[in-house]
């Protein structure tokens, strides 16, 4: 200790009892043991923030006894990139199996290159125990989301695919569910070249 200084410290305050964990991560790690996760990563590049999150998740999954595979591809058209990640080809039509049914896996995990996530978020989704689970995020304004729903089919034909982007408030007030529409359900105009 330096000459001439006196250290004064208060008695340490007793620690509060830790709150019970909201998620059972031990259960999630047991659930993933022996399973195969295919990471579907559409896009061309990622940030170091994404890379750190991704590598942390990969290490944690392998340490928990899971196998991982990576399917990554790029196209300037995002729907093509997603098809390519599944080993599909949009020119072969709608009735295709992921990777033509040749890849054995238990889970597909789609992560866009601009998403920041944690290992805990993966396990929270796994603990939902649903066939399909998803999350979404707000844009920079903190109110608008990337979630969009199509207008009625007639509006789609008239306006050429205008969507209503949802806000947190509009989602909370929504009375009807989002509608899933097969892409073969819509009739697209014929394009003629000259």
Task: Label the predicted regions.
Residues 3-72:
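N-proximal low-complexity "stem/linker" segments adjacent to membrane-targeting elements
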Residues 78-101:
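Short, conserved alpha-helix that lines the donor NDP-sugar binding/gating region
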Residues 96-116:
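Short beta-strand-to-loop acidic/aromatic patch adjacent to the donor-nucleotide binding site
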Residues 120-140:
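Conserved donor-nucleotide/metal-binding helix-loop-beta segment in metal-dependent transferases, i.e.
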Residues 134-152:
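Short beta-strand-to-loop element that shapes/binds the nucleotide-sugar donor at the catalytic cleft/hinge
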Residues 153-182:
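Short, flexible, basic/aromatic active-site loop/helix in glycosyltransferases
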Residues 185-194:
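Single conserved hydrophobic/aromatic residue that forms the stacking wall/gate
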